[in-house]
Amino acid sequence: MIKLPDFTKAYEHENDFYLSCDITRISKILAHYELYKMSLEIPGAIVECGVFKGASFVRFAMFRNLFENPYAKKIIGFDSFGDFPETEFEADKKLRAHIVKEAGLQSISTEQLEEVLKKKECSQNIELIAGDITKTIPEYAEKNPQLKISLLN
């Protein structure tokens, strides 16, 4: 569980973000926008493998509601929705340490993400799958062989 922002101070938070963010934050928003536009004509769900704090998941939900409608594409999020998981993969250990140092160990909870999506009126046609993605993704794919993916993040 993370500390959610004060939604009554959205304007202030927006200004703080743009005044303090690194250029890579803006490039990420633009990249997600371009990827979403490319997926518009492709049937299938938007799938995010690793929701973490929920920013890109919420961004895709808002894009969907801006460009289409809530039922145009299901958005599926896979995450532990708890502590950022450990890794045994040597190449990922340094990256994990950097992420934990910069962003903290704790992910957004499913309840918090659902609350945020409801406040933004983007909570329809969303599915959150909690657990170890190395297990939950194969299980989900086996139970949903009809799944088509238009955007994988």
Predicted regions: what they are:
Residues 2-23, 40, 45-153:
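S-adenosylmethionine/decaboxylated-SAM
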Residues 29-42:
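Conserved alpha-helix/loop element of class I SAM-dependent methyltransferases that forms part
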